[in-house]
Amino acid sequence: MKQTITFLLLFLVAINVAAQSKADIEVSYSEISFFENGKERNHKYHLLANPTQSKFFNPHSEEIESLTSTPGGLANFKKTQQAALQAMIAQGSIDVTKMPRKVEPLYVLKSSADSIMTIHDILGTDEPVYYTEPYSEMTWEIGDSTKTILGYECIQADTDYHGRHWTAWFTPEIPIQDGPWKFHGLPGLILEVREAGGKYGYVADGIEKSEKAINGVYGAEQYEKRDRKAILRAKRAMRDNPMGHLQAKGINVEISSENLSKSSEADDFIETDYR
């Protein structure tokens, strides 16, 4: 009898785990951010979420991840990238936005059961890295203001997070404590969030029920664990000195200074506390 009960408990736990690996909703978000030249980005992200876990990602990038998840597919993709880079070098101008690439290689996986986020990203064009972060680094102050987004009544909340002040709008009508990027921890789904300077934000433009699997990241074993601030410092160094990054990889080119993108401290990342 005891063995039967144990089996049933294990069976029920297995069912629960399997159920929790599926999303309840899928939300599409438009990113608000700008290139160094002031041009607005036009990136799209999706959030697959249920009450205990979620995955935030760019669907185009995940499609490329799928195509390059085999050795042959990855080799073909790298050949295409190298050919594009050599063509740009021959023209005397490098624009990485025109290279075959993952449009936005960022993945944010959240687990409320563990109160941990796992963030996967790429340094440069070919260094997969990841780090983890506790939920406790984000705390909110809920206000009184309300507005309607996609037909849902939303409530204002504010937080100071990793160097920027953010204002979010969440709806208790969808009781999933999640949102775009790393945002979480409010008593309802976050449909809009913007930083005080207007340089970054996310706005929901579609919500639907979903039973899609919340899978991990393709090739997760290839990602190297790093420190969050160290990753941001490395990204900043690459942005400030892209030629040095190429030369460190054995790519020696001569590009006139006017063909290199200019960056300044005002053109900073979404997180600024790495300095």
Give the positions of each predicted feature:
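Structural motif
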Residues: I149-L150, Y161
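Gly/Pro-enriched, hydrophobic low-complexity segments
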Residues: I155-Y218
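Bacterial Sec-dependent N-terminal signal peptides
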Residues: M1-I25
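Hydrophobic residues in beta-strands and at strand termini
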Residues: I142-G143, F170
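Extracellular or lumenal secretory-pathway regions
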Residues: Q20-E137, G143-T146, E153, G198-R275
